[in-house]
A protein has these predicted regions:
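N-terminal auxiliary segments of SAM/dcSAM-dependent transferases
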Residues: 2-44
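The AdoMet/dcAdoMet-binding core of the Class I SAM-like
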Residues: 2-9, 58-133
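A general beta-strand register signal
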Residues: 51-52
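Single conserved hydrophobic/aromatic residue that forms the stacking wall/gate
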Residues: 132, 137-141
Length: 141
């Protein structure tokens, strides 16, 4: 369950008895894609916030933490990673981290919802632009 009340976006986790809230300056974007509801907010302290179907996906301020932890443990424990496939990851943050590994020769990103990637280009440009500058031939499916 999520709510936007009195300038706060709140994601509530009833089963765990917890909630996560960010103070919102304004809503930047909202659309219903063929796959999910996509919302982008500008927050007071965490930069932009992406929400999919009411669930927080990333913020400008802390997205690197999520992507680093998803990527580096797997690639550092693999003997010699050369080819990587990322399922999802439309904001391109995981792809950005994968491309930091010099042994990776191919990286494929498969994202069902192109709108997530397009809105990431607009509102979270750093991970997306990094991936294009690092490996311009990276395929997006």
């Amino acid at each position: 369950m999520t709510a936007l009340n009195d300038g706060w976006f709140t994601e509530v986790f009833q089963d765990q008895g917890t909630a996560f809230s960010l103070q919102v300056k304004r809503k930047l974007h909202e659309e219903q894609t063929p796959f999910q509801k996509l919302e982008i907010y500008e927050t007071e302290t965490f930069g932009n916030l992406m929400v999919l179907d009411g669930c927080v996906m990333l913020t400008t301020r802390d997205n690197f933490l999520y992507h680093e932890m998803m990527t580096h443990p797997a690639l550092f424990t693999h003997k010699n990673p050369k080819k990587v496939v990322i399922i999802g990851g439309g904001d391109c943050g995981t792809l950005k981290e994968v491309l930091k590994h010099p042994g990776v020769e191919e990286a494929w990103q498969v994202e069902i919802d192109e709108r997530v990637t397009r809105m990431s280009e607009k509102y979270f440009p750093e991970p997306v632009s990094y991936t294009h500058l690092t490996l311009p031939t990276t395929p997006y499916v």
